[in-house]
Amino acid sequence: MTAANKNIVFGFSRSISAILLICFFFEKVCGDMEHDMGMDDTSGYTRPEIVQAGSKSFHWLCTLGFLLLLPSVVTCLSFAGRIYSATLLQCTCAVYAFLEAAVLRFQDNDGVENRTSRGTAWFLVGLTWITLFFGGLAGGTGFLVKSKRLQTFISNAGEKRLSYIHRGLSFLTVLTGWVKVCLAPVALFGFCREAHTGQCIAHGIMGSAFVLYGFIYVLVLVIPWIRSAQTSYSQDYVDSWVMCIWGVVNTFTEHRWGREGWSVHDYQHTFMGIIWWTGGILGIFLSRNGRRTFVPSLIIIFTGWAMSEHAQHLIISTKVHNMFGLVLMCGGALRIIEISFLLRDKRTLDKIHSFQYLAPFCLVCSGLLFMGANEEQLILVLRLGGDHSAYVLIIVSGAFLVYFWMIACLEFYLYLLEKGKQGFLPKSYELEEENNNVSFELDNISNEDVDEDTTPFNV
């Protein structure tokens, strides 16, 4: 078969696959529209009285800026080797983290902040100051280096190892800041207490996991040496292992085997764990020796379908879960198209196509939708007079901003590395200075030669 015929066959198969996927999702959306489109009865709900909304909103924005956004910039600086700049900005984060834990409070209308939010605040204080300490050691801060014990510790550990520790701790502060920012509204509205605690934990962990999964996808996509790394294993191989392990844990923790009866919830989540570890085994086998495979993406599609079919107590909750499942299925399907048809089972291409940014965004968006799909939050939406469409739009708007911040941080990191290669001064100025130095050295040599020639010769 000639190259032209191969391209024709490949293009035809790609078109057929795309048409089938479009038909599948069109049928899914139309099928959902045929369901009961009624609304929840809100006659029993009263509009909530939010006390000091302005000051609480400003407090949350400050927490967002100093405990999540600024630490993200610090992490970029740390990974780019700018330890001094990272440590300087980290001082600001550490001071605010202490004020957040010691003075400021995310209190509900009863003046109470839950223990999880309070404990996270104090944990973040300790973590930020420890990170700042290691940053000072790695950067050679004066008052720290004066101590003989610290000098011995630095010499034994090595500056390179200390910088690695600082990078890891800096990234951990970003993750903890994400938890704190997400817990703040929970504390302000008094959510996730008593019987609702388990549901909030499940939605928070699973939703954040999808957001982190999307970040890893875009990290591999944007950073060129990770994208083009010639390793013995592919990204699908790692994904399959993670899904397999997570599936095993989920299978044996969602139900007390032999100690209680089975409920619909147990069936749903336990069998979801089973499909994760069984699919993970197949994915591990097919992706061995560095090969690509569709299995992790297919597992995501089935997970999205299962979540979209979960019936909830509230109609708005059912519709939000349905949207979450639909977006998750889109992410898995787009990933299959990328691997099988765009990359053609290769690791990477010469350049990044705009299409490749879509699958990670779907994962980030689905994660935020799942985090916002717990029952108490949706009851608050009903009490405020909103519906599922407005709620989904505001969450997707947040997903756009989160995804923008992820890509912006990665691009900022690459910019710092590029500036580091060029040097502090502009390249033209450096070349000019180098030429001046060379000419100055030549002048010195010529002057020395003249002096030697004019030296009197004594017989």
UniProtKB/Swiss-Prot annotation:
Looking up InterPro entries in the UniProt record yields:
YTP1_C
A Pfam family that this protein carries is Ytp1
Q: Which residues lie on this side of the membrane: Cytoplasmic?
A: 28-59, 104-122, 192-205, 288-295, 344-351, 411-459
- Compartments (UniProt record): Membrane
**Keyword rRNA-binding among record annotations:** no
Q: According to Swiss-Prot or TrEMBL, what is its membrane topology?
A: Multi-pass membrane protein
GO cellular component annotations of the record: membrane
Q: Where are the transmembrane segments?
A: 7-27, 60-80, 83-103, 123-143, 171-191, 206-226, 267-287, 296-316, 323-343, 352-372, 390-410
Record's keyword terms, sorted: Membrane, Transmembrane, Transmembrane helix
Residue spans, topological domain Extracellular: 1-6, 81-82, 144-170, 227-266, 317-322, 373-389
| Protein name as it appears in the record | Protein YTP1
Look up and give the organism this protein is from: Saccharomyces cerevisiae (strain ATCC 204508 / S288c) (Baker's yeast)
- Gene (UniProt): YTP1
